[in-house]
Design a protein with these regions (language model features):
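A structural motif detector for beta-strand N-caps
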Residues: 142, 148-150, 154-156, 160-162, ...
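Terminal amphipathic alpha-helical/low-complexity segments used for targeting or macromolecular assembly
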Residues: 1-135
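Generic preference for well-ordered secondary structure
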Residues: 50, 54, 128, 132-134, ...
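Short amphipathic alpha-helical segments, especially helix-boundary/capping motifs
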Residues: 43-47, 122-123, 139-142, 174, ...
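Right-handed parallel beta-helix
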Residues: 118-158
Length: 203
């Protein structure tokens, strides 16, 4: 097995990687829709990764591998609970997720002051290790009423509907058409034609 991926990293002013977006992945012949990056001038670092099947079995040791494994789940190249996610929490930095992108917690106060002085809107959506899925991947034939309630690393099959109070964690999701009004916890999957009622939680 051969896995090749191209990612775009976002960093703090001190050079710390905050997150990595992988729009291009070739998973042993299965590919994402994007085949190459547009020829834009950018100050962001472009990351190229080449993995084998053994890398899926290794614990996570850095931000780059953490984000690649989360992308593999949400692109549905791998099933939940099929790859090693040990070390995920320790590898992911806690990040301020805003309408202007990922910002380091150490720098958010400065950014807030800057936004007020320059009359630029800075909307803080969450402070978390995991970003919303839809900041990175738009799954096909899926409805999500509140995108903040589905994390990157969620596995959503076509025909899935997630209502306003539904929640899907990373390494969790649906294996077919489903109506999700409750919570799907990490490590849990629901089968085809499932209906998870409001207020319910699967663990």
């Amino acid at each position: 097995m051969q896995i090749k991926a191209t990612g775009i990293s976002s960093k703090s002013s001190k050079g710390k990687i905050l997150e990595v977006f992988f729009p291009i992945i070739d998973f042993d012949g299965k590919k994402t829709h994007i085949k190459e990056l547009p020829n834009y001038e950018t100050s962001k670092e472009i990351i190229n990764i080449s993995w084998g099947s053994e890398d899926l079995k290794k614990p996570i040791s850095d931000v780059i591998s953490a984000y690649l494994k989360l992308h593999l789940l949400s692109y549905k190249f791998v099933l939940p609970n099929s790859i090693n996610l040990e070390g995920l929490f320790d590898s992911l930095p806690n990040v301020v997720w805003t309408n202007q992108g990922a910002i380091s917690i150490d720098e958010i106060d400065e950014k807030l002051i800057e936004s007020k002085l320059l009359n630029q809107d800075l909307n803080i959506r969450s402070i978390d290790k995991f970003p919303p899925l839809t900041d990175f991947i738009i799954p096909e034939n899926v409805r999500i009423a509140d995108a903040s309630r589905v994390r990157l690393g969620a596995y959503l099959s076509p025909g899935t509907t997630i209502m306003h109070e539904g929640f899907v964690n990373f390494n969790a999701g649906t294996l077919g058409k489903a109506m999700i009004e409750g919570r799907i916890s990490s490590g849990v999957v629901v089968g085809n034609n499932s209906d998870l009622g409001g207020g319910s939680s699967t663990m």
